Amino acid sequence: ARNDTGNINEGGTLTVSNSSNATSVDTATFSSSNSYSSQYPTNSSDVIFNDDGTKMYVSDSSTGYIYHYNLSTAFDVSSASYLNAYASGFGVQSMAFNNDGTKWFILNTTQIREYSVSTGFDTTASNVSATTTSTLSSQDSTMMGVTFNNDGTKMFTVGASNDKVYEYALSTAFDISTISYTDSVSIQSQEIYPTDIRFNHDGTKMYITGTNGRDINEYTLSSAFDISSTVTHKGSYSLTSSDSYPTGFSFNNDGTKLFTTGQYYDRVNEHSLTTPFSLVDVSGEHSGDVINTSSTNNYDTDPDSDTLTVTAIRTGSDEGNGTAGSVGSALTGSYGQLT
């Protein structure tokens, strides 16, 4: 493709390769945060919501307390008010509910515990009782994040000892006494200390956050909720503007909001997503091989099945001018790099 172009926001990264639509740029932006001082963990490890976004739960990995907030406006952290704190007696790294909130799952570094909740999503101590505990240390001794597929027949964890995602089958939905380990996939190339895991609603995207990269990595799965299928890393969204030690995150129901928490600030951070469930994406420049080939001046004439080889590059602000560059090296501009 000759004289091709791509649009990128300041601070973003644009990547070009020889494949269809092979460009990426951040589409999530940090929008707001809310701090709760004494009514918030000092070592926050995860943030989750009830099914309609009117309740929020934030865990503390050091004390085992889980803080419950009401939200007067659904999925709006600025409307949160403290309700109570549940003492789990468990070093909480991550949390999840079943679909109606009558089961609550709490993960520490080696075990997951299932709780019965008599009134869905009401974590008042009198409503909560522990029922089952399962040990996961055979797969990883530092489990950090947990989530389920939609019907509760699969559970996924991420561990920081081996930097892998682990998949388990549940013969009875949302019953951890019936789990069996099935598979794993390494995410070490992107994160060497992962802290949480989530999927989009249809299970075709997986997200991993971690404290080494200080970002959230987005992956696609060729088969929904199946890590034995082709798992492809799409890119990452930096969290350094909201917390330099990110530990947990969640989405709202339609994927237009991302919520993160971490252990550097005592707060929950809210991020807006331009495209639902897309932390890295492109707009306006992905018509074909090597950014944009929609213009007749930019068409490449080889079939898409052919190999495209870049033999020379030049750097500069004007066409036909500039200095010779090295093929295979990143081009550094005022606002980022072209790789």
Please state what every model-predicted region is.
Residues 248-280:
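Blade-level signature of beta-propeller repeat domains, shared across WD40, Kelch, NHL, RCC1
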Residues 1-21, 281-331:
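Extracellular ectodomain surface segments
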Residues 21-25, 70-78, 115-125, 168-177, ...:
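Short loop/turn segments immediately following beta-strands, especially the blade-tip
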Residues 51-52, 97-100, 150-151, 201-202, ...:
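Residue-level detector of Asp-centered blade-edge/turn motifs that repeat once per structural unit
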